[in-house]
């Protein structure tokens, strides 16, 4: 139930019965890379219900799930789901066994390896896989096949962001748990439709606006809907493709106006002086031409964020 009085019930599942008839499995939702912990209820090998896992005090979703994570399990047993590998035979895809498919892939990889060497093989992981699955993928290519050509879809989509994270935090992940969003004074949502792409993260930010007076800064080429316009402190709707100009202008304003501890910044950022010099071209006039943003909103965003 989602209602303390039981007036609102989840009626999406056709299966009914005593609790003893169901098997519970604790796992991680794989709809996106957020990593919500879930509890699956199954009956005779079929997923009947998925709920947020609150029993073990682990995970970042605190029992919350988005609509896809909670109600999207119907695809698992959908009659149109492809359950076995399909191999292109003469232009037509024919169903084959897993053993045949894996053997074909292994043989072709070995042939390529023998002919052109390990660097001719490459792997692309996914942010929708678990950390363990991505780890095994890179282990296969680096240790077994000898290839270092390993990448991830998340890095392909946002290589500069990942490089920035590596430079700042020595790894490609955030330095704080996602739940800290609801405790922040200011949250800058940059080029992300957080409520739609990562609803549980959007909930954390909304929680902060209600209970912690968190200010939200939205920077996005699209007009992201965030429940209520009143909750957004500053909105930066810039020209598509000018992300770097927006970030650079914000950085320049923060530095020029003395809104940061320069000594701390120099100790944390290699080549700090070169960074400052690289921002010199991002004047108010040039940035407005690149982003189509009036310069009066950028100082407000910079001051709020800093």
PLM feature spans:
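Extended active-site and interfacial segments that coordinate phosphate-rich ligands
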Residues: 43-83
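Catalytic and ligand-binding motifs that coordinate phosphates/metal ions
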Residues: 23-55
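Iron-sulfur cluster-binding cysteine motifs and their immediate structural context
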Residues: 1-15, 35-45, 66
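Short amphipathic alpha-helical interaction/hinge segments
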Residues: 11, 40, 74-77, 258
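Cofactor-pocket helix-loop regions in the catalytic cores of large enzyme subunits
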Residues: 8, 14-33, 83-306
């Amino acid at each position: 139930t989602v209602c303390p009085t039981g007036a609102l019930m989840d009626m999406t599942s056709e299966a009914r019965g005593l609790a003893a008839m169901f098997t519970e499995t604790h796992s991680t939702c794989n709809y996106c890379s957020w990593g919500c912990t879930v509890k699956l209820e199954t009956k005779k090998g079929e997923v009947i219900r998925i709920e947020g896992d609150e029993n073990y005090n682990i995970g970042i979703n605190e029992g919350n799930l988005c609509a896809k994570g909670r109600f999207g399990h119907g695809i698992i047993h959908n009659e149109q789901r492809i359950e076995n590998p399909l191999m292109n035979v003469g232009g037509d895809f024919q169903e084959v066994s897993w053993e045949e498919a894996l053997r074909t892939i292994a043989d072709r990889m070995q042939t390529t390896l023998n002919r052109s060497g390990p660097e001719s093989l490459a792997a692309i992981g996914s942010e929708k896989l678990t950390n363990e699955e991505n780890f095994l993928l890179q282990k296969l290519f680096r240790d077994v096949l000898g290839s270092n050509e390993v990448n991830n879809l998340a890095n392909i989509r946002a290589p500069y962001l990942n490089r920035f994270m590596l430079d700042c935090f020595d790894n490609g992940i955030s330095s704080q748990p996602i739940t800290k969003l609801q405790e922040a004074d200011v949250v800058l949502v940059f080029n992300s439709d957080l409520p739609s792409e990562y609803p549980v993260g959007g909930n954390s930010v909304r929680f902060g606006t209600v209970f912690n007076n968190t200010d939200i800064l939205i920077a996005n080429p699209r007009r992201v809907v965030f429940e209520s316009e009143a909750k957004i402190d500053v909105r930066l709707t810039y020209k598509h493709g000018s992300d770097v100009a927006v970030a650079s202008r914000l950085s320049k304003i923060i530095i020029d106006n003395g809104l940061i501890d320069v000594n701390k910044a120099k100790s944390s950022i290699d080549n700090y002086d070169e960074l400052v010099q690289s921002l010199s071209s991002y004047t108010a006039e040039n940035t407005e031409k690149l982003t189509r943003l009036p310069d009066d909103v950028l100082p407000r965003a910079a001051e709020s964020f800093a």
